[in-house]
Amino acid sequence: MVSEAEFLASYPQKCPAGSLPGTPGNTDEAQEGALKQLRSELEAAGFKERLDDSTLLRFLRARKFDVALAKEMFENCEKWRKEYGTNTIMQDFHYDEKPLVAKYYPQYYHKTDKDGRPVYFEELGAVNLTEMEKITTQERMLKNLVWEYESVVNYRLPACSRAAGYLVETSCTVMDLKGISISSAYSVLSYVREASYISQNYYPERMGKFYLINAPFGFSTAFRLFKPFLDPVTVSKIFILGSSYQSELLKQIPAENLPSKFGGKSEVDEAAGGLYLSDIGPWRDAKYIGPEGEAPEMFSMK
């Protein structure tokens, strides 16, 4: 098993110059001091893993560089990881029903955006909750969510960083609401709230861009009701678009990387798993796979 030090040394650890303040390679003296203090206090408390600059700076940014609050957040995260089984979830959890779930709730990663981020697509408008409940449970869906987060952290982002030549810390999300009604939008937003809770508290500062496309009339009004539950920084990264979204997406995602169904030029052979199951990106390219190895799969195509 590869050591944490070897793993971190295998891909860039600095973001490009001019990235957001407080990111690796873009810190001032006060932020460096806070980073040093946080690491010292966590080491004194007995923590030995996940104390690298990138991780600690994410927790500090999430708490506006308040060391005490960042420490509390980190400690709560580590407690959750232990209780939820997060550290071993990639080995322990198998989502063999995913090919069936994908028919009623399409969720998938597909290539990268112009900043090198992995792009995650979620077709909420195609969700059929009645059929999904026959296949899986909410508990397993949440396990799947955490499994995917761990895959992003341990496989997708490192590979994307190697491909980009600099540290890639965040992902780009496209959530398609085509076909959804305003009456069911509230249940969709409820899911977003639950997913955001896990993201904000246990995977802070991982959202780069978040596009809600094909948003129905009145969706923005409904979304405002949920804003109080979301961190303001998170809200600033969310873009709500109607049916004329292609030009905005293409500003962020190269046409050759954007699936054709969303106005791009990327096509996937069904024999390779199709768009929903192929999982195409640097993390599946031998040139960018490091000592961690290729990302495991949570289901079998056989």
Swiss-Prot record:
InterPro entries: CRAL-TRIO_dom (IPR001251), CRAL-TRIO_dom_sf (IPR036865), CRAL/TRIO_N_dom (IPR011074), CRAL/TRIO_N_dom_sf (IPR036273), PI/PC_transfer (IPR051026). The lineage of its organism: Eukaryota, Fungi, Dikarya, Ascomycota, Saccharomycotina. GO terms for molecular function: phosphatidylcholine transporter activity; phosphatidylinositol transfer activity. It is a peripheral membrane protein. Required for transport of secretory proteins from the Golgi complex. Catalyzes the transfer of phosphatidylinositol and phosphatidylcholine between membranes in vitro. This is SEC14 cytosolic factor. GO terms for cellular component: cytosol; fungal biofilm matrix; Golgi membrane. It is found in: Golgi apparatus membrane. One of its GO terms (biological process) is phosphatidylinositol metabolic process. Keywords: Golgi apparatus, Membrane, Protein transport, Transport. Residues 97-270 form the CRAL-TRIO domain. It comes from Candida glabrata (strain ATCC 2001 / BCRC 20586 / JCM 3761 / NBRC 0622 / NRRL Y-65 / CBS 138) (Yeast).
